[in-house]
Every structure is written in C-alpha cells, then in structure tokens.
C-alpha cells in the first residue's frame, strides 16, 4: 500500500487487509502522516502509532548511518543481503513519518540519526500477524527508485518476498 494511501476509501478495506495478513498474506504499507486517515488502532493489522509532531520523526540526512537492530531478520537477508552499500547514493532524505510505538508483534529493524540528534528506530518495522506478515516502511523508497538507487530496489524486493522464500 503506497505512501499516504490510507484515504477514507482505503480505510474501509482495513478489516480485509487484516484478514489477508492473518490468513498468510504479506502486506507492505508505506509511510502515512498523522493527519491522514490513518488510525493507529484500526488501520494497520495491529496497532502502530506514527510519531508526532512529524518533523521530529524523520531523518533528513540521506547519508545518515544505518544500524541493524535485528540483523538476521528475513527482510534484511532474503532474497538480498542488505548491507551498508545499499544505503549509498540515497537522495533527499532517508525517511519520514517514522513509527513511534507498535504492538508487540512488531520488531523495529533499523536505527539511524541526523547529525546531533537522537537515533530513531521506527523507519522499518515487521510483524508476524497470524499466519502472515505486515511490514511498515517509512523510508522514501519511491524517491530512491526514481533516482535509480540500487539499494532501494534491493530492499523493496525483500519487502515483497514472502518470508518462507528459499
């Protein structure tokens, strides 16, 4: 589900998306603003609170160092092993509208910081929900893809690949 896609029309599909994940689906959602139709309790399959005010929940330095919080997680390893080279050449910024809090199903996978600021760890989260997975990505992948940043394409491939892919 693309950036800021949760409008009033798509909100009505939240229960369908939740059911899809619980039955084994792989759902990828991208960033949403707190003033979009995103309800932290009912829009995602399990609660996810977006940080507010939004200007404090973003990484504006496209060269900010990225740390792996769960390095063996499948999103960082299949089908592509995501490494520090994948963060080179990023344009504009790393991401925005980061997650502040999430249900215990979710793991926060990355940490990064703007110069002189505290690290944020809500850029990429992943949770096992029933028989499926929900990944919420606040990185600006669409912008990186427009600028042909290979690491963004590699990470996107990982996001859409089922967890049991061999």
Give each language-model segment a name:
Residues 1-8, 140-141:
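The substrate-binding groove and active-site-proximal loops of carbohydrate-active enzymes
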Residues 5-91, 149-151, 155-157, 161:
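A glycine-rich, often tryptophan-bearing local segment used as a flexible ligand/cofactor-contacting loop or short
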Residues 13-15, 94-96, 122:
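A generic local structural motif
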Residues 28, 48-55, 59-62, 82-85, ...:
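Extracellular ligand-binding/catalytic regions of CAZymes and related secreted enzymes
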Residues 93-103:
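Active-site Gly/Thr loop motif
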